[in-house]
Every structure is written in structure tokens, then in C-alpha cells.
Amino acid sequence: PNFGGYKLDLNGNLKISTTVAKGVELNEKVAELKEQGYITSVTTNSRGVTTVTYKVSMDDGVESTQVISLGDLQKAAINICNFIMNSIEFANANDLEAKSLNELYADALQTITSYEKDDVVPSTTYSTITEGYDWGPAISKVVVNVGKAMSGNIDASAFEVNVTRKALNGFLLGPSRGTRNVTAAYVSDANGNKAATGNYITLELEVGPDLSIGSPFNYNFFGSGHNEYVDTAYEVTLNKELKAADGSSVNFAANKFAADTTWICDDFDLDGKFSYNDEKFGQIALTYASYTPEAAKNDGKKNALIIWLHGAGEGGTDPRVALLGNKVVNLATDTVQQYFDGGAYVLAAQCPTMWMDNGSGQYTSDGTSKYTAALMELIKAYVNSNSDIDASRVYIGGCSNGGFMTMNMIVHYPKYFAAAYPVCEAYTNDALTDEMVESIKDMPIWFTHAKNDPTVKIGTIDEDGNFVSNGNYSPKAYERLTEAGGSDIHFSLFDDVHDTTGLYKRADGTPYQYNGHWSWLYTLNNECKENIDGEEVTIWQWISTKSKTNRGLEKVIAKVNALNAEDYTADSWAAVQSALAAAKAVAADQNATRTQINAAMEELVADRAEDPGTAG
């Protein structure tokens, strides 16, 4: 049962026949094996073709983690026969040779397909479930079609799950084959949902930031420079007895792929395509994924739009990569959606190269991007085609390359966006002119970065353990905007990027450390927080309150917040505080009308009159 290091996938005893051509002598080993019972018969037909029938048992002590099914062996043998029949040598053979070869082929084909079918492990289908994690996507579950009704508890140790991964383009980084650890097993429906009875068994698989064997992605380092899907094949086999609900034995080799379900990602429209004819760069094609909140369809109100711009590794033409490479799917979960009345639309735009492409195919050195106009036209087209979107509440952000593009878009179109959230942004300080700073200082902006970012480096740690900025990127942009008078500019600066779930740890028990460039995890997990007006506010809670319509009101609120009580009488200060509280409530109301906003602003201005009265 050992075929080149592979274990033949059999169940119990099975007879296999081998055809031996006329004139080939059998050695004494055949007689020896026949005497031992491994060979059950040796027969020769009228044409001199000998058939040797073997009895194969899997109790022969063959140790191998790699399994090949009998069906695969048959297919391979048939393919070899077909190759011989179609070869030039065969075509050039004389009639007599061709006739004998034809006869031999017929005999071989017959013996290849003549086996005891009832004893063969039945092949069945499986489906996979993919989820987005902090480190990227992973296949977390395999759903096996057992073909029989199952019930009760399922022993997870009864299953062996093997996987092979093949890069469709370029070299594969990481393992090409391996075994997945099964952490749980249960009866389910076809979608992997637990069930009391059902014809399916779902296997939960171990996942983690270092278990790349479970990833459907490969980073094409030597090619596109993007994350790309790999060809993934699973095989699930049994290593223990399994009983169906009726008590009958269950056996299978699940090796026929049926479908993949990618949680949350499948809730997006993944077919977005947009074309733009740029005056300088010619025809530009963009792809995109978009999400429509279910509640927004019939709530009778306009809803916000969140725009995400991917990093360099998520470019290309497959929007799934842009959603899963950086856990952007979280924008469609309650983690973010809970703050938006009726939910928020999500637009994840994707460029074929990288946002920092200045038209040469290389990284920009002057802060320009060939995609600037094309992206703006895509955004406008998407907003215009969805009448339910509130054009005064369009928020733009992204990470790394996408952080660069976020800055690029707001300095080119400062009046279009209600707020921005650049993460580990790569827009250099040299490219950010004073005029640009002046144009966006009144826009609400929340920066995020990690001190130990090795890609977009923002500083160093001195000998005393203090962070020293290098005067570039997020820290410098934040500094310049606040010094210019920006009153709603925020910055979450983290020491590092580490696991916050408690699930993944280092050998010493401390949280698993991700690459310091990955500060987008804090943004997408809503873990950026700041104390604003005495209240701890998260980044998405903050973004959800921003609107171009109430930006004037927010500026007045900021000025009133800076007033001092000692400059007012007790009564006048109480009036100011009352008007301030009312104004804040209006500013936070996502459905506030222009009339309500103007009234709140007038009341606040009136109560903070030039002559505040006599202090006391």
C-alpha cells in the first residue's frame, strides 16, 4: 500500500489487479507473495496476458501523512494509457504492433477499472468557510457532506484534514502542504450551522497569525507585489469509526471541493468596476467592493458612506483581497455599524497597481498619484447612483498607501469629505504644503500610527525610552494642522501593534506582536480612543457624528469650549453651558436638519455674547 511515500486510501481489505504483458516473466517473489496470501490469483488469457490480483491491507505498517486515493491512482493509470495511445511512437507502429498494443490497452483499462466497488472509500464533497482576522484571511472551517443523517456528539479526533496550496502566479511563500488541527466537530447544515440532525459535519480548524497553511492568500513578492488567492485543495478522512444516526458505519474521503463561503465578505457586492479617461494618463480602470446596510434600504433616511483605501499589498483586480487583506470586512459589522443610525454604506476602492503610482508604475516621489481624478469620479458616481447616501456624511480613510491616498484626496478635494481617518499614512511632509494645511485644518481628521512602524517610519526611541519624531508623516501632519488652528484633529499613537483579543501570545505569555506597520488593526477594531470634552470617545463613535452640514456648528462649539467660567457671571455662564449642551446634542444628531443646526448655532452665539457680564 506504499506508493512513492503516499499511503493508499483504502478501508479494510481490497483486491487490486495488475496486468502483465505477454512475454514478461514473473519472478519468484510472486510465488512467495501468493503463498503468503497477498496475491490471491495469477491468470493468463488466450493472448498470453497475465493478470495478478493482490489483496491489500492497510495493516501492513505503512506510515505516511500523505494519502492518495485509489480513484486517483486509477485516473493516473488511465491517463498514462491514453498518453501511450496518443504518442507518436504508437502512431508510427506497424499494424501488428498496434493491434497487440490495442489489445494490451483494453486489458489494462479493464483491470484498472475492475475492483470491488463496495470496499472502496466513497469520495464526497466538502465546502470551506473563510473568515477575516487581524492578520488576514484564514479557512476556519470545513463542512463535509457525509451523505447520511448524523446526530449526537462528534469526536473531533476522528478526523484528519490535509491541505495542499498552490500559487497560481509566481512563487508560493509558506508551506505548500500540511495537516490542519481540528479543534471541534459537530453535526451541521450545509452552511456550517450547528444542528441536532443533518447530513453534514462541520470541522473547526485551528487558526493563528503564524499558521499560513490555513491562508487562502499568497503574497506574490517577486511578481505583482500583491496578495493573491492560491489554489487550495482539502482532503478529510477518518481515522476512527464513525456511526450514523441509524447506527450504520460512516466512511468517506472528502476531496471534492463544492464551494467557499467567506463570512461578511460575501455580504458585499464584489463586482464593482469603474473606468475613467484621464487627460494625462489615459484610460484608468478601478474595481471596488461595496456594502449596503440592510436597515438603510427602507428606513426613509439618508445614510453615511465610509470609504476605505487599501495598502500596496491589496492592489489588483480582485476586491476580495482589498476586503480581507486588512480586515476591512469589520466596517460592515456591529463594531462600526452600531454608531450609524440605519447603518453606513461602505465603498472599498481598488487600483490595479498602488495608490502611490505616479504614472510610471513606481512609487511617487512628489506626492502625486495617477489615480486621483479617477478615484474622485468613482466616489461621485457611487454617491450619485445611491440616492440613499447622505453626501454631507462621506468619510474617507485607508492604510499605508491608502493613508497616503487619503491625504492626497482631502488636499485635492477639501470641501467634499466630512471627515478623514488616515492610518500609517505615507504622505511626506515635504509634499504637504502650507496651502494644503490651511485648506484642510477645519476638516475633522483622526490619524493613527505606531511608534515602531518599520515601513512608514515616524521616529526612534532614545536611550531613555522616549519617542523622538523624525518630523515626517502622521506626527508632523498632526502638529502642523493643530498649529494652524485645527480644532478637531486627533492622533492615536501606539507603542506597537499587538494582539488585543487575548487569544494569541508569545512564548513568554505576552500578547502576540504584529508588524508595527499594521496599526490599521486598531482603527478597524475601533480601538483608537481619546478623551473629548471629558468623555472617552472611540474613533468610529467620533466619525459617526461628523457632517459637513454641522461643521460650522462644531467650530462654534470648539470656541465656546475654550471659554473660561471666571469671565462670566454665574447666571450667564449657566446659560452658556445650557446652550452648549443643546448645541452638542444637535451636532451629534445624524438626522439634524439645517434649520435645527442654524438655531443651535444662533443660540450658542447669543449666549456667549461679546459682553459676558461682570464676573463673580
Question: Each PLM stretch: what is its role?
Answer:
Residues 2-116, 594-609, 614:
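Preference for extracellular/luminal or secreted protein segments
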Residues 117-143, 163-303, 477:
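A domain-start/cap signature at the N-terminus of enzymes
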Residues 297-301, 358-400:
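Gly/Ser-rich "nucleophile elbow"/oxyanion-hole loop immediately N-terminal to the catalytic nucleophile
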Residues 305, 312-373:
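Active-site machinery of serine-nucleophile hydrolases
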Residues 309-311, 449:
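The conserved beta1-alpha1 loop
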Residues 383-439:
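Primarily recognizes the serine-hydrolase "nucleophile elbow" in alpha/beta-hydrolase
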Residues 446-448, 452-455, 464-550:
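C-terminal catalytic histidine-bearing segment of alpha/beta-hydrolase fold enzymes
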Residues 550-616:
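Beta-rich interaction/scaffold domains
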